[in-house]
Amino acid sequence: MLFGRLTERAQRVLAHAQEEAIRLNHSNIGTEHLLLGLMKEPEGIAAKVLESFNITEDKVIEEVEKLIGHGQDHVGTLHYTPRAKKVIELSMDEARKLHHNFVGTEHILLGLIRENEGVAARVFANLDLNITKARAQVVKALGNPEMSNKNAQASKSNNTPTLDSLARDLTVIAKDGTLDPVIGRDKEITRVIEVLSRRTKNNPVLIGEPGVGKTAIAEGLAQAIVNNEVPETLKDKRVMSLDMGTVVAGTKYRGEFEERLKKVMEEIQQAGNVILFIDELHTLVGAGGAEGAIDASNILKPALARGELQCIGATTLDEYRKNIEKDAALERRFQPVQVDEPSVVDTVAILKGLRDRYEAHHRINISDEAIEAAVKLSNRYVSDRFLPDKAIDLIDEASSKVRLKSHTTPNNLKEIEQEIEKVKNEKDAAVHAQEFENAANLRDKQTKLEKQYEEAKNEWKNAQNGMSTSLSEEDIAEVIAGWTGIPLTKINETESEKLLSLEDTLHERVIGQKDAVNSISKAVRRARAGLKDPKRPIGSFIFLGPTGVGKTELARALAESMFGDDDAMIRVDMSEFMEKHAVSRLVGAPPGYVGHDDGGQLTEKVRRKPYSVILFDEIEKAHPDVFNILLQVLDDGHLTDTKGRTVDFRNTIIIMTSNVGAQELQDQRFAGFGGSSDGQDYETIRKTMLKELKNSFRPEFLNRVDDIIVFHKLTKEELKEIVTMMVNKLTNRLSEQNINIIVTDKAKDKIAEEGYDPEYGARPLIRAIQKTIEDNLSELILDGNQIEGKKVTVDHDGKEFKYDIAEQTSETKTPSQA
């Protein structure tokens, strides 16, 4: 906090506040201690105004001790509470509004009056202080607010009226203490000062990625000038931030823009103490340049080269390359100052420096742990933005969320409000119907409810004031989870049980295949427990096996268990990539080709949803060169699209399916389901498929995959389970039409027998169910048989399928029997 502008009496008030906190054994200095400090200075305007309302020091002490009492013995440094910081901030704002260049006791009182949620506000309420009258009394005691340094300010800026109307004076704002402190940028500020001190071409341009703190460096220079921490050459300089949009705005006729800009330049040259700051420097190029007119950059060039105009620019690397570098004459007039992204350690220091401002604004405590979590989590999971901007945004939003959560009106108050509204409407209706006795009773009820509401509201507010709201690591994790969709909050008991039983969940849809299900489940648990390699995807798998054994189904089941919907996965059908050039569809078309602006089918989806299951289906169908693009994804967890953006794959599960080697197995007569020597068959299938996989794909690709899993062939028992699962799905579909279907075990066995095919796996079962049940049922429905609301039993008598239609009883009204 900035205490340099406090008067001696105001400084004594803060010292008294600290003494009162120590006397009362309190661990922090709050608004109540500031109020006690004001009362300890009886000659101050604040104390005199309060005394005029019959508020004395003894009364204030009595109220404070009644409200919060004495604390335990406290040892250690006293810190200001967020509300006390807010009061100091508001007092500075009041001084600025009254055009005072100092902060006195009267401004602190105005700050306490404006901050209406602390203990001091409750003391004022208990002592029946009329806030509006007290404020008017303070302003009256100060005399005419226009009589301070306004005239001096006007005379100072009279030399540059046009510039003052088009630009913000950063030095004045820095003097008011409203600029955020600049931390850890001493090297860059020193370099800017060195360039500004040159004889010619003394124009630094700050170049860096968006959000690294370029504008903050210009603000840091303004603060250094105000604090007298600059060389003699820059003392008493004014840093003016020029907005090119304001300069162009309203210039309707030719020559108007040029005239306005020339006027600004003349004022700067005559004043001799102005440093011009142009944020988004690339807007100079082309600004005001209508047909036949000269743009802003060409008007400024001569003055920039001669050193008549000191200008600081700020722009991003991309904009500098596109707009400034292509104009060599403009580029040589500026000296680049590279602004790099700060490290994690530096960002933590920056956030700790800004903590007071955010605590005062949100009125909560921000812990060191929350700051460190914000920096680490934003650095790890928000890959398309830069520190410190993304970490600051994270702290700001999390603080806002915590503040709103703690100040949401409780349900009991909302219920009383609704009851009051209801009684009020009933009373109005009774008056309208001239039922005055009933209306009088309702009026009494309304008065009673309003009193009850006020008591409950005061009780809630008192509880809120007594409670210190803090920002925790968990709050930060919640916000970043909302930004990215990646679950980062602590694992609760329900989720823990869900993760531990993930195998059972997957087996509800995938019959058999224990090896594959176990590998996938372990990868998900590792990631959720925070043990996975942070530079690689959660897991990458190749599923091998004959067609129809559940490779794609397992990927769908995983997507459903993680996101609640099996369509939530990103599916890439590799049969669409049989040509070499089709790889451009994954990362986007090259510049100059159709579709360059649309982005890649894969990269765009992952950018939008970084936490996802990606399925590359039937990989052996794609051109072999397509897989070269996946090498970096599997190893480093990132991929660069055609626009140069790095897409983060570190929070994805990559599943590739293939039935490579199936043809060779068929030739060797090992394909098929069931068999006498299942273990021996599986080993033969496994060896054959792995051998074919190595022949089909390059070793550097296979070496980057976490696990290659060969799926087992399905047994007849597993086929029967699959039939039951498919019949249950059909039952659920028919229940929507109010048809209850029961399929007997004999019918299921016959379907499994008819759908059994050693070459095609489980897929023939779908066709068998269509042929044996769905076709006949559809004929029954369309043939005029009223089977809606009835029970249909499907059985097999050894020769053919039988369909028995009967009325539903109370026991058969649910489809769960199928």
Curated annotation (Swiss-Prot):
Region annotation Repeat 2: where it falls in the sequence: 80-144
Gene3D superfamilies the record matches: 1.10.8.60, Clp, N-terminal domain, P-loop containing nucleotide triphosphate hydrolases, UVR domain
Cleavable signal peptide: none
InterPro entries for the chain: AAA+_ATPase (IPR003593), ATPase_AAA_core (IPR003959), Clp_ATPase_C (IPR019489), Clp_N_dom_sf (IPR036628), Clp_R_dom (IPR004176), ClpA/B (IPR001270), ClpA/B_CS1 (IPR018368), ClpA/B_CS2 (IPR028299)
Positions of the UVR domain: 417-452
Record's keyword annotation contains Nucleotide-binding: yes
Chain residues that bind ATP: 208-215, 545-552
GO biological process: stress response to cadmium ion; stress response to copper ion
Pfam families tied to this protein: AAA, AAA_2, AAA_lid_9, Clp_N, ClpB_D2-small
Region (Repeat 1) location: 6-71
Annotated function: Required for growth at high temperatures, probably by acting as a chaperone during heat shock and targeting heat-denatured proteins for degradation by ClpP. Required for biofilm formation. May act as a chaperone regulating CtsR activity.
Official protein name in the record: ATP-dependent Clp protease ATP-binding subunit ClpC
Organism: Staphylococcus aureus (strain NCTC 8325 / PS 47)
Gene encoding the protein: clpC
